[in-house]
Amino acid sequence: MVGTTTTDVPPTMGVKIFSAGVAACLADVITFPLDTAKVRQQIQGEFPITSGIRYKGVLGTITTLAKTEGPLKLYSGLPAGLQRQISFASLRIGLYDTVQEFFTSGEETPSLGSKISAGLTTGGVAVFIGQPTEVVKVRLQAQSHLHGLKPRYTGTYNAYRIIATTESLTSLWKGTTPNLLRNVIINCTELVTYDLMKGALVRNEILADDVPCHFVSALIAGFCTTLLSSPVDVVKTRFINSPPGQYASVPNCAMTMFTKEGPTAFFKGFVPSFLRLGSWNVIMFVCFEKLKGELMRSRQTVDCAT
């Protein structure tokens, strides 16, 4: 299981939730420029007014952003991103083992079905709770002051207020459907692949349950997740970032992309998306496993002392 550590005592649900939140925030801080590059590539070609600047490749996108809008633009939306990890990743990852045990129904070895069911459940709940932070994060990453475009928002909390007052409170949940589909795919693929890879490596004595095992499992999980979730991710980003009335619905957004830009539009930003998700997975899972272990060892030490 994702929650298994090398300590004798299994981590509590609270330890898992806390560890997942902290590890996810650390991973977000380190990989956020890649996420911003992914968003910019995904919306490229949507508005003719921004056609003066073209983003080419991961490094090209990052350097172009830094030169034209300043290095800090790479971290625009980070506060909302951290809020997202606290409300989203802590639940979808931290609750995974607990929910999986519920679906296992006393079975000694969790089935693939119980793993997928756990991923679907925790991913769905986390998306609904964390969607407002996702909307604000994407819009702050996407907005640009170039070519006469006036930024819609001056900061994180200003974005929450303007979206709620000028559009509607429900607009903070805009794009919930594609984001739900995206994160159900991500959660199931990411956690189940990591779980299966880690179990196979340890069970077959290829690697011990330590950093190298966590690294390999997380990287493979990141690639599989990016491949399956990319089309939905691009549609989600376009729909969330769109002004009111641009797209009639999520299917209309997808169809507009297909007819105007072709099928390759659904894989825009794939490389930065994989680099971001792959590195995010490695950092998050390695820190998650280590933090859980240290917290449980500290707890055992305190219990022994008392």
UniProtKB/Swiss-Prot annotation:
Post-translational modification note: May undergo sulfenylation upon cold exposure. May increase the sensitivity of UCP1 thermogenic function to the activation by noradrenaline probably through structural effects. May undergo ubiquitin-mediated proteasomal degradation.
A Pfam short name: Mito_carr
Residue spans, topological domain Mitochondrial matrix: 33-73, 133-177, 232-265
Mitochondrial intermembrane topological intervals: 1-10, 97-115, 195-211, 289-306
Modified residues (Cysteine sulfenic acid (-SOH)): 253
Keyword Transmembrane helix recorded: yes
PROSITE patterns: SOLCAR
Membrane topology value: Multi-pass membrane protein
Matching InterPro entries: Mit_carrier, Mito_Metabolite_Transporter, Mitochondrial_sb/sol_carrier, Mt_carrier_dom_sf
Extent of the Solcar repeats: 11-102, 110-200, 209-294
GO CC terms: mitochondrial inner membrane
Keywords: Ion channel, Ion transport, Membrane, Mitochondrion, Mitochondrion inner membrane, Oxidation, Repeat, Transmembrane, Transmembrane helix, Transport
Functional summary from the UniProt entry: Mitochondrial protein responsible for thermogenic respiration, a specialized capacity of brown adipose tissue and beige fat that participates in non-shivering adaptive thermogenesis to temperature and diet variations and more generally to the regulation of energy balance. Functions as a long-chain fatty acid/LCFA and proton symporter, simultaneously transporting one LCFA and one proton through the inner mitochondrial membrane. However, LCFAs remaining associated with the transporter via their hydrophobic tails, it results in an apparent transport of protons activated by LCFAs.
Quaternary structure annotation from Swiss-Prot or TrEMBL: Most probably functions as a monomer. Binds one purine nucleotide per monomer. However, has also been suggested to function as a homodimer or a homotetramer. Tightly associates with cardiolipin in the mitochondrion inner membrane; may stabilize and regulate its activity.
Matching PANTHER family: MITOCHONDRIAL DICARBOXYLATE CARRIER-RELATED (PTHR45618)
Protein name (record): Mitochondrial brown fat uncoupling protein 1
